[in-house]
Amino acid sequence: MESFLNSINQKKIKSEFPMTNNIYDITKNGERLNIEFKETLNRGYHLKKERRQQLASQMKYRMELGDGEAVYFIGVHDDGHLIGLSSEDFEETLFVLKSLAEEVNAEVLDVEKHPAEHGTVGKVLIGRSHDPKNEHLLVGVAGHVDHGKSTLVGTLTTGTLDTGSGGTRIFLDVQKHEIERGLSADLSFAVYGFCNEKVVHLKNPLNNREKSRIVEKCEKVVSFVDTVGHEPWLRTTIRGIVGQKLNYGLLVVDASTGPTHITKEHLGIILAMEMPVIVAVTKIDTATNDRVFEVKDEVFKLLKLVGRIPYMVKSLEDADFVAENMNQHIVPVLKVSAVTGDGLKLLDELFLRLKIPSKEEDLKKPFMMYVDRIYSVTGVGTVVSGTVRQGKVRKGDKVLVGPDATGEFMEVGVKSIEMHHYKKDSGEAGEVVGISITRAKMEDLRRGMVVCNDNYPARAVREFEAEVAILVHPTTIKDGYECITHIETIAETVIFKPLDKEYLSAGDNGRIRMKFKYRPCCIHEGQKLIFREGRSKGFGTVTKIIK
């Protein structure tokens, strides 16, 4: 019994019937509003399917009357008479209540015990869970500048058609210079969801409370990471694709322009990360039917060239089929317009049906997240954000952040956790969260650090080996060559030393010893990496940690 009570969140919640009121004064007036009496419950009967559904519906009704809270008195007869329960029956009844609460996305918040004629009477406060049980799909959006990435996402998440001027991109490009120039300069994040298999749009996408409600209410939440299409900011695009633990890539191609060198570059990054990809041929309202067909054909040829199987999605049945069978090899292609709305319902259907990889194994591992952004919030303090790679972090946890330039990790506390402005008690693998931390200043932190539990095997690595493929290089890569290398959210200058031969050229594969030039980073075997500097580019996998 004590072990169960110790697992309950002990914080007090404001209620019309506070937990400190005299229990007899409340029960003598009978059941009403959010108050329910239960003499005893047992899992053998009350958790059978039909009875469980009835009791879950009853609990949901009581919570609605209590503005999200219900008060259950256990060991109490329907007429309000205090009977009491043995310790075994008390614990069994609590177990059933907890199981029912999980059915309606709620949790047991507090328990009081009071003496009665034949044992103990309990007063149990049940409230909405701060960790809604929903599926979370993370989609990275890539493509050339002006091909309509932000406009498509803005229209998709709001249901508001664009006028043709790209106005819906304002829902994502929130910096003044981005709005004025119509160009995204950093990663942007957007969200929408599905309830009862119906799309839920944001009526006011700039309202943080509305984003919060999407996370709270929807059974499936789709988060978009909108990357940058302008070539000078390619590093930011790489960070968006490599550093966010994405489930799928959405590659956007203008129906008039067709695939460009940037389109091919972004596709290459997505494929290097071994990520399933969807292609949206956008702005079909601005091109002739013949040109749309030509661009579709160009996209198909490009996908086949890199060993993928394009699949044209023309109907809801096609969307259902490809979602059921999609993998790294099959690439659905859709024709869409943010102005006319053509193809948007097919995209909705695809995102609704797409499978989310199981994170069961990741949840068993110690918590770890790579830092993507660092900022200070008035009244909150220092916040780090990123995608949780594995495990689960809870409010109140002690975690490590690092490594710093000397290779050390510092201990900090987790004050609060948010996902799309929705306050949560925890964050888990696959979720994009902001974590408010104590005892750390912004100047002590940098992008590419990890936040992790003390039982995660965090280590400051200076040198490692990788198996790489050189895609493009104007000359040869020799000992001492330097290049920016991306691993997760890390973007650091690395010194190369070929191991199998004296030098590597474009088209070569080989082992390379790499050394972070300025500071150590926390990496491990098996991680994907991309390097790009000037006209040089390649990708690979970390195979061995040296030190």
For every predicted segment, state its role.
Residues 83-84, 119, 195, 232, ...:
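Switch/connector loops and helix/strand junctions flanking conserved nucleotide-binding motifs
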Residues 134-234, 244, 249:
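P-loop NTPase switch module centered on the Walker A-proximal segment
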Residues 32, 70, 244-248, 273-277, ...:
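Short glycine-/polar-rich loops that comprise or flank the Walker A/P-loop
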